[in-house]
């Protein structure tokens, strides 16, 4: 499997880092990373890693200004793309087909080729413009996976929340996260089921 990972300057850099770390442990997945200029700034603000450290997690790292990169062509086959975190600027550009920079171009290619595109939008609150852009992309088949915590898991750390979001992103490609905690039903429902087996 070949996956493109785009990271933009929206807050949420730990999500992108955790995704790359998880994919790094999957030998059957080849990753192509593009970090926007502001993604690099956000990574160094929000994580203990440098942009160089994060780039090293991917099999291939591409210059965000390189419109001639291999992932800018539909003839280079991939299984899809994840933009995590996805800024509202990037989301709007993808919706409009405005392929500014390699993140936007790669997403545009994935869309036109009918491949899987997953966006992890980071903004709050959401304006009508944001929601309309998301709705339009959803109607095009783009998966919107906002980083919502699952409180039924009783997360104790930020990492617990991050791992859950990454697991839900990987679900979109049929990939299993080693730290995924899945809904098992209500405790009383489980007990009733076991008692009646």
UniProtKB/Swiss-Prot annotation:
EC category: transferase
Coiled-coil regions listed in the entry: none
Keyword Transferase: yes
InterPro entries from the UniProt entry: Flavin_trans-like, Flavoprotein, UbiX-like, UbiX_pad_YclB
SUPFAM superfamilies tied to this protein: Homo-oligomeric flavin-containing Cys decarboxylases, HFCD
Similarity comment: Belongs to the UbiX/PAD1 family. YclB subfamily.
Name of the protein described by the UniProt record: Probable UbiX-like flavin prenyltransferase
Source organism of the structure: Escherichia coli
């Amino acid at each position: 499997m070949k996956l493109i990972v785009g990271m933009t300057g929206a807050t949420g850099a730990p999500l992108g880092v955790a995704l790359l770390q998880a994919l790094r442990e999957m030998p059957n997945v080849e990753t192509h990373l593009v970090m926007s200029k502001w993604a690099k700034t956000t990574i160094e603000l929000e994580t203990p890693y440098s942009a160089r450290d994060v780039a090293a997690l991917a099999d291939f790292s591409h210059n965000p200004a390189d419109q001639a990169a291999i992932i800018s062509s539909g003839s280079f086959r991939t299984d899809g793309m994840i933009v995590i975190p996805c800024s509202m600027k990037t989301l709007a550009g993808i919706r409009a087909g405005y392929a500014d920079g390699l993140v936007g171009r790669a997403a545009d290619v994935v869309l036109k080729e009918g491949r899987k595109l997953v966006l992890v939008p980071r903004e709050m609150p959401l304006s009508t413009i944001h929601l309309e852009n998301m709705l339009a992309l959803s109607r095009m088949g783009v998966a919107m996976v906002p980083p919502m915590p699952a409180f039924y898991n009783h997360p104790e750390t930020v990492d617990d929340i991050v791992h859950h979001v990454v697991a839900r992103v990987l679900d979109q490609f049929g990939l299993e996260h080693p730290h995924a905690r899945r809904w098992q039903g209500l405790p009383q429902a489980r007990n009733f089921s076991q008692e009646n087996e």
